[in-house]
């Protein structure tokens, strides 16, 4: 086991703060409509240019192990915020840096770190309650477009295309992002269904770039039991092979000999097949298989309907124009089912929704309606170069997450204004002791920081702007894009409530851990020997070769 270096108290925290500052300073230059670009080196190919905070954070690894631990903890703030809300990564990083920086001053002054953390937690709870009170539902296409534009770094084209996609497939529909073939962004809407089951073996993958199995014009076999014996499957496999088309098998499970045979046939190119487990459990699984059957124009092969696998024929199989199977989900695009049958099924499910008593059942039934009636929208991102394409695609994906978050929890005034307004409620809070009061003050100070950073990146004076915004009321704030003051909602500067809430929660959580850190342990760097020939110490004693009687 390698030797370890251990650091305690202030010296440990100082190194950790050093790492936090390096990462946060690199990330926060991207904040706001006038945020700057960061260029990331790639081990092969050209560099990547980005304004996405989490992409910058993920690239940073520091040589000093103690500083790196601090950087990695803040990286976790950005990643977690991105995973949950899809945006707000830079805001979360700025908040975490501010809470740690202010908190460390109080810890150095001898305050109790645990009480500081309790004060921070109290302030965060009060702020979130206030944000939810300010929040208003995001319902119109215009509002969705505004949220998308801001998340995509003030790119109104991206905001509009996402709003159009949501309008066409519904807020519950599936929206995917792909590389386009032209310079302009395009929107394709295809009827389709997605469910959360992926391929049963990675050997089914035929598209290495996307790590997906893509089937063009396939048949769909639906079976409600487990398939282990290949003999049951052979008759239908032979019929599909003769037809010369790929096959998707959806069953309770496919394993053993049956799965092995399908994989071998796929690898050899005899028959392109993919096997996936049926979605859901119990009665819900049966209902979802029936949904897929109606969508694809097939029949579920089940004993209840008097059908068996060995007697199945091609007309029992469903069909689709295209099916994409990833590790964790399957998307059926353009199923061959009759529109009237699909409509009747949707009506039937809507009646069940009205009759359902539990919220869980209602939610699951609504999901099924969305999958049958929603469809799939594909946003094709256009760009002049590959570097621009990657950067733009990342922004579209961020904006898509942000708009979903806005629809889910509503919107608040953007540009850091919501946090400034929430300070009034937090300022009235009182802790159980002086140290907890200091923790509340730490969060109060941090809540100004996103606005300060947006203003600094726009080239204006942060203190002047913060003072003017604080003296205003309601949605009054500073639009860094135009340099004007006014009602942020009317100017279209909006943030999803979920993004602001998640950023603050994650920042406070990790910052609280850092403030209460007293010891850090890291591996000692090994001293590598200098270059050159290795030591040949074992070659001595060869001087007596003269007496060898040559």
Swiss-Prot record:
Name of the protein this chain belongs to: Chaperonin GroEL
GO aspect biological process, one term: protein refolding
Catalytic reaction equation(s): ATP + H2O + a folded polypeptide = ADP + phosphate + an unfolded polypeptide
GO cellular component: cytoplasm
UniProt-listed Pfam families: Cpn60_TCP1
Keyword Nucleotide-binding: yes
Protein family membership: Belongs to the chaperonin (HSP60) family.
Example GO molecular function: isomerase activity
């Amino acid at each position: 086991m390698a030797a370890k270096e251990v650091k305690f108290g202030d010296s440990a925290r100082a190194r950790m703060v050093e790492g936090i500052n390096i990462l946060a300073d690199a990330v926060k230059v991207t904040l706001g409509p006038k945020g700057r670009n960061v260029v990331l080196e790639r081990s092969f190919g050209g560099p990547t240019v980005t304004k996405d905070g989490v992409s910058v954070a993920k690239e940073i690894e520091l040589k000093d192990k103690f500083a790196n631990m601090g950087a990695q903890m803040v990286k976790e703030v950005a990643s977690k915020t991105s995973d949950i809300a899809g945006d707000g990564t830079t805001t979360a990083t700025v908040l975490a840096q501010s809470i740690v920086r202010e908190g460390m001053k109080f810890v150095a002054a001898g305050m109790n770190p645990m009480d500081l953390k309790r004060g921070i937690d109290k302030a965060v709870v009060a702020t979130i309650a206030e944000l939810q009170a300010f929040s208003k539902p995001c319902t119109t296409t215009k509002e969705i477009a505004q949220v998308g534009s801001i998340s995509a770094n003030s790119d109104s084209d991206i905001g509009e295309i996402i709003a159009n996609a949501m309008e066409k497939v519904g807020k519950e529909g599936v929206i995917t992002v792909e590389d386009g073939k032209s310079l302009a962004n395009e929107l394709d809407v295809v009827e389709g269904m997605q469910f959360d089951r992926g391929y049963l073996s990675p050997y089914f993958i035929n598209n290495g770039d996307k790590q997906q199995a893509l089937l063009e014009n396939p048949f769909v076999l639906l079976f409600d039991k487990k398939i282990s014996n290949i003999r049951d499957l052979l008759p239908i496999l032979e019929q599909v092979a003769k037809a010369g088309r790929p096959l998707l098998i959806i069953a309770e499970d496919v394993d053993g000999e049956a799965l092995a045979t399908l994989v071998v046939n796929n690898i050899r190119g005899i028959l392109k097949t993919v096997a996936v487990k049926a979605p859901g459990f119990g009665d819900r699984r049966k209902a979802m298989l029936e949904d897929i059957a109606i969508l694809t124009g097939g029949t579920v092969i089940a004993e209840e309907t008097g059908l068996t696998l060995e007697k199945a024929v091609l007309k029992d199989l469903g069909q689709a124009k295209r099916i994409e199977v990833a590790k964790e989900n399957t998307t059926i695009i353009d199923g061959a089912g009759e529109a009237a049958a699909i409509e009747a099924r949707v009506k039937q499910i809507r009646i069940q929704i009205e009759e359902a008593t539990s919220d869980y059942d209602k939610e699951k039934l609504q999901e099924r309606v969305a999958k049958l009636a929603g469809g799939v929208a594909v946003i094709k991102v256009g760009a002049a170069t590959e570097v621009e394409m990657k950067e733009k695609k990342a922004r579209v994906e961020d904006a898509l997450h942000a708009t979903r978050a806005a629809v889910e929890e509503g919107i608040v005034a953007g540009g850091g204004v919501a946090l400034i307004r929430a300070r009034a409620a937090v300022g009235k809070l009182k802790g159980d002791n002086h140290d907890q009061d200091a923790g509340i003050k730490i969060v109060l100070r941090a809540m100004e920081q996103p606005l300060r950073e947006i203003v600094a990146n726009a080239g204006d004076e942060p203190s002047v702007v913060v003072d003017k915004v604080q003296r205003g009321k309601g949605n009054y704030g500073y639009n860094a894009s135009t340099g004007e003051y006014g009602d942020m909602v009317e100017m279209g500067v909006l943030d999803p409530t979920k993004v602001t809430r998640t950023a603050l929660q994650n920042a406070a959580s990790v910052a609280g851990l850092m403030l209460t850190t007293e010891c850090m342990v890291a591996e000692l760097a090994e001293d590598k020997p200098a270059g050159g020939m290795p030591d040949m110490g074992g070659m001595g004693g060869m001087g007596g070769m003269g007496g060898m009687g040559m």
